[in-house]
C-alpha cells in the first residue's frame, strides 16, 4: 500500500509530538495530562513511530468500513476489535506485544481538504485524553495510518468526510530505522518549518 502525502504528514505530526511532548502541549494550550492521572504522560520524548504495512492495511479496511456502514466505532466488521483486524492483516503478535487504536472523522457539506482534515484529526485526538495517551505511549513502535475520503451520514445528515484510523502496535524485539526523503520541488521549506512549528 502507498502512504498518501496527507497520511505521511500526519505521521510527521505524530512523531513531532512524540519527540517534544511539552512543545505539543504548548502548541495546543492543553496540559499533557489534562483529563488523565498526573504523570500518565511523562513529558519526556518517546521514540518516533515507523510505518508498518500490515497495520496500515488493517487501518485502511476499518476506515473504509466506517464510511461504507456509517458507523463510527472501534468495533468493526463482523464484531472485530482492532487486534482482530491487525492480526487478520498479517501483523504478528509475538513475544511482548501491545496494540492501540485511535479513530477520528470530520465532515463538511462542501469539498473537504484532506490536509486540513489531517490537521483537524491530529488536534482533535490530542484534545481527547485517551487518544492523547495512545499517541504518547512509550510501549509502541509502529503505526498504520489510513485516511479515507468519502460520504458519511451522521444524525441524519450526510457529509463529505475524512475517516481516519490509526493502528499503533509493538511486537517482538525488532529495531527500526525510519525517516523521510523529501524533494522540496516548490522550495517552500515545508518539512524544515514542520520541525520548527
Regions found by a protein language model. Name each.
Residues 2-69:
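A short alpha-helix/helix-coil micro-patch that ends at or immediately precedes a cysteine
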Amino acid at each position: 500500500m502507498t502512504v498518501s502525502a496527507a497520511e505521511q504528514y500526519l505521521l510527521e505530526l505524530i512523531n513531532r509530538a512524540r519527540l517534544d511532548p511539552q512543545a505539543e502541549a504548548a502548541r495546543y494550550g492543553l496540559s499533557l495530562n489534562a483529563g488523565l492521572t498526573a504523570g500518565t504522560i511523562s513529558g519526556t520524548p518517546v521514540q518516533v513511530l515507523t510505518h508498518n504495512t500490515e497495520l496500515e492495511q488493517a487501518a485502511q479496511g476499518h476506515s473504509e468500513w466506517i464510511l461504507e456502514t456509517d458507523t463510527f466505532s472501534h468495533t468493526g466488521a463482523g464484531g472485530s476489535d482492532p487486534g482482530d483486524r491487525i492480526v487478520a492483516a498479517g501483523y504478528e503478535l509475538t513475544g511482548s506485544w501491545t496494540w492501540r487504536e485511535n479513530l477520528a472523522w470530520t465532515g463538511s457539506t462542501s469539498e473537504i481538504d484532506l490536509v486540513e482534515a489531517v490537521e483537524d484529526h491530529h488536534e482533535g485526538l490530542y484534545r481527547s485524553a485517551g487518544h492523547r495517551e495512545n499517541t504518547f505511549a512509550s510501549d509502541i513502535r509502529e503505526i498504520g495510518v489510513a485516511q479515507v475520503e468519502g460520504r458519511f451520514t451522521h444524525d441524519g445528515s450526510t457529509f463529505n468526510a475524512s475517516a481516519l484510523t490509526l493502528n499503533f502496535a509493538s511486537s517482538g524485539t525488532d529495531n527500526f530505522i525510519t525517516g523521510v526523503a523529501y524533494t522540496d520541488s516548490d522550495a517552500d521549506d515545508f518539512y524544515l518549518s514542520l520541525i520548527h512549528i
